[in-house]
């Protein structure tokens, strides 16, 4: 297994790190974000109320509807002069600091290496770089030392580029992968799919390549929040960057390990646009056993 040390730290060490980051992000959002200060005050919550990880339940939820209807600048914690990237995808705007981009790339490096994308891999990126997730993929591939071939979105060029450079890995969205598959037999050994609405792996039934799906909804602003490892048993959650809860739909009650619940996400390090207790609407269950790959991060799977 190729993994960084954080993926393998003990549960107790990880929870200490999560609590430290949770306290910081709650204080940061309260002090800097118009939206979160307003919602925290309406709930009667202040940053000092967060003393344990369980205290995250004191905080109000944010819904997908709110994320899409509230002005992005109300979530913003910094002046635009501190923002180095703005991306709009699926009618949702993300803003990033240098630190946010660095975290994105670190998470993507882990996700790619978990899929056995290594130095010497030849990876094609099929997509429009106006979708900034592909920029994170590009930077991560270059950091690993893989050879990168941007394929763009012009389907007339795809087959020539793929054959010319003998690509072994394809990274794209499910929609573009299926579009390519309609006109071209996919020669890759690995396909990495950036999924927005489900963490499922439906593409695996359509190709002989090994498919690694990532959960990458636009609201999160990261392409690698959850990733499959080479053992392909559920999705690892990047727990040093995200705190997740699995709750009964329509309530604040947690489900027991093994039962399906609604995925609720808190981003622990997002600087420009904090994301605290987002109810995703995605049903998942936590897998109770440790993964055979050796990573300590918990895994989730669709019911």
Q: Which residues does each PLM region occupy?
A:
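Redox-cofactor binding/interface segments in oxidoreductases and associated redox assembly factors
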Residues: 78, 85, 125, 170-172, ...
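Active-site glycine/GP-rich loop and adjacent strand/helix microenvironment
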Residues: 1-13, 17-30, 34, 144-303
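Conserved AMP-binding loop of ANL adenylate-forming enzymes
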Residues: 109-146
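Short glycine-enriched loops at secondary-structure junctions
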Residues: 101, 128-130, 175-176
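Glycine-rich phosphate-binding "P-loop"
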Residues: 95-99, 143-148
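Nucleotide 5′-phosphate-binding alpha/beta core
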Residues: 1-114, 118-119
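Conserved ATP-dependent adenylate/AMP-binding module captured primarily in the ANL superfamily
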Residues: 105-122, 155-167
